[in-house]
Amino acid sequence: MARYTGPSWKLSRRLGISLSGTGKELEKRPYAPGPHGPGQRKKLSEYGLQLQEKQKLRHMYGVNERQFRNLFDKAAKMAGKHGENFMILLESRLDNIVYRLGLARTRRQARQLVNHGHVLVDGSRVDIPSYQVKPGQTISLREKSQNLSVVKEAVEVNNFVPEYLTFDAEKLEGSLTRLPERSELPAEINEALIVEFYSR
């Protein structure tokens, strides 16, 4: 399944979450798109709830179905809780770390920065958004990339960096100090439903 490239605001309303992270998509119309307005959402079956939760998480991180399933299977081989490990793997993707550091305003922007070769990991260019960042690794930008308008705008408005990251706003450099805990990951996701979906 290809990555969704349509209007993010419409998808956000359909899934009931803000995919941009700003919450603006749901401010005026916090209901699914369509001609009938609020109050028209059908009650979902158990399968429907599981599918919706999977789609919420997949679109939140901007991952296609193949990558999503591969990470899910990888998480199954790790010690600990399957669903929690899965979310930690998603959170440790390079594009997501760039977003969490505040070098991009959205994950989509962060993915473009990585794809276009602007991002360095331990001083070496990495252009693979799905690259798994390990604790202790340093994330920075190429010198000429530090003046990009999208980066400057993102850094100006960013006022929060998760506790599992460190960030130097002067150097535009940060690192993953440890893997995140479940309490630091998106609370609006019920990963148990996703485990149930793939276990059917």
From Swiss-Prot:
Domain of life: Bacteria
Signal peptide span: none
SUPFAM superfamilies the record matches: Alpha-L RNA-binding motif
Keyword Ribosomal protein belongs to the record: yes
Annotated InterPro entries: Ribosomal_uS4, Ribosomal_uS4_bac-type, Ribosomal_uS4_CS, Ribosomal_uS4_N, S4_RNA-bd, S4_RNA-bd_sf
Positions of the UniProt region annotated as Disordered: 22-42
S4 RNA-binding domain span: 92-152
One biological process term in Gene Ontology: translation
Disulfide bonds: none
GO MF annotation: an example: structural constituent of ribosome
Gene3D superfamilies linked: Ribosomal Protein S4 Delta 41, Chain A, domain 1, RNA-binding S4 domain
Family, per entry: Belongs to the universal ribosomal protein uS4 family.
Role played: One of the primary rRNA binding proteins, it binds directly to 16S rRNA where it nucleates assembly of the body of the 30S subunit. With S5 and S12 plays an important role in translational accuracy.
Subunit annotation: Part of the 30S ribosomal subunit. Contacts protein S5. The interaction surface between S4 and S5 is involved in control of translational fidelity.
Descriptive protein name: Small ribosomal subunit protein uS4
Organism: Bacillus licheniformis (strain ATCC 14580 / DSM 13 / JCM 2505 / CCUG 7422 / NBRC 12200 / NCIMB 9375 / NCTC 10341 / NRRL NRS-1264 / Gibson 46)
Gene encoding the protein: rpsD
